[in-house]
Amino acid sequence: MANIDAPFGLRPIGNTVGSSDFQMTEYLIPDNEATSIFQGDAVEIDDNNAGFIAVQEAVTNVDNIGVFNGCLIDSDPSTGKPKFSNFYSQTNITQGKIKAFVFDNPYQRFLIQGDSGTAAAAADIGKVADTVATHSGSTTTGISGLELDVSDLETTDGQLKAIAFTGDPQNNELAIHANYVVQFNEHAHKTQL
């Protein structure tokens, strides 16, 4: 059975310390930030704007801070009222802040779809790889297009570590677009796995 090519970014599913604690931390997005951030995108502390987050570029050695889940614009420029969204698109605010909610527990586990470059293999588990953005995030659903770069799986130097396959009978674990359980390998709050 072929897997469906329907990326969803990084979706939290639990953590390695035994609980299903899905706590988020509030960070800030700079006013008028031009880069969109979608639910499920990996984010980092912005080097150019201290104290703010930015979308994590795929294939990079910068430590992630976590995964974006949504944002609250204190005062939406078009309505003057607070607005929550599961994705961020360029907003020029006149007052208030743009607050981002981020899953930043370094021991959080996530689900992510593998890309179409290489079929999944049992030997993938325990290896690390970067993410790849072969699809854009959706402004309709707000969901990320981020995928795991399966052809990049190796023993060192990658954003994410493959922990397991999902065990979902609707997902062929040895085909392209397999769903992986992963954990951050490169994270600002811990050393590499």
PLM region spans:
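Surface-exposed, low-hydrophobicity beta-strand/loop segments enriched in small/polar/acidic residues
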Residues: M1-L193
